[in-house]
Amino acid sequence: MPNSWEVWWAIVKFENSEELKIRPVVVLENQEAFIISLKVTSHKPRDTYPGEYDLMRWSDAGLTKPSTVRLSQPLQLIITDFKNKIGDLDAVDIYAIQQLIAYYK
């Protein structure tokens, strides 16, 4: 069962498309109906999109390359979308993401 601040491989639907892709996500909150998660990408944060965070301790979380968390596009996933746990975010990254979420609310 995915828990907050874990990194998982999950099936994610592309924006404006029916295409699916298995990609890493950060679990924010496990609610009853949905598991709120954030996309993780290997692309650097984009200046034109606020709410993108460059993970400082990406390798400690089990990721194999530098990664960015996209806070601007939360996902509502269900338990069957989750495939394998990759790891856990470091406290430094958790705190930074919490601060960004509070700032952009």
Question: Residue ranges of each PLM-predicted region?
Answer:
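Compact nucleic-acid interaction/catalytic patches
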Residues: 16-22, 27-59
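C-terminal terminal-subdomain/extension
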Residues: 58-105
